[in-house]
């Protein structure tokens, strides 16, 4: 699976992953909305939104 693995403020980068899914999680803090992308589908804390998907580059 090919997933994006960058944060909201950095240039888009991709990674070839062993997992079959990609994730995009997002939350708000003093900097605004933060978006983090990567491989797999991690558990998140309350207040953090997450979107998991199972196709290449699906987590943009």
Curated annotation (Swiss-Prot):
Keywords: Acetylcholine receptor inhibiting toxin, Disulfide bond, Ion channel impairing toxin, Neurotoxin, Postsynaptic neurotoxin, Secreted, Toxin. It comes from the Eukaryota. Disulfide bonds join 3-22, 17-39, 41-52, 53-58. It is found in: Secreted. One of its GO terms (molecular function) is acetylcholine receptor inhibitor activity. Expressed by the venom gland. CDD domains: TFP_snake_toxin. Its main location: secreted. Belongs to the three-finger toxin family. Short-chain subfamily. Type I alpha-neurotoxin sub-subfamily. Binds to muscle nicotinic acetylcholine receptor (nAChR) and inhibit acetylcholine from binding to the receptor, thereby impairing neuromuscular transmission. This is Short neurotoxin 1. It comes from Dendroaspis polylepis polylepis.
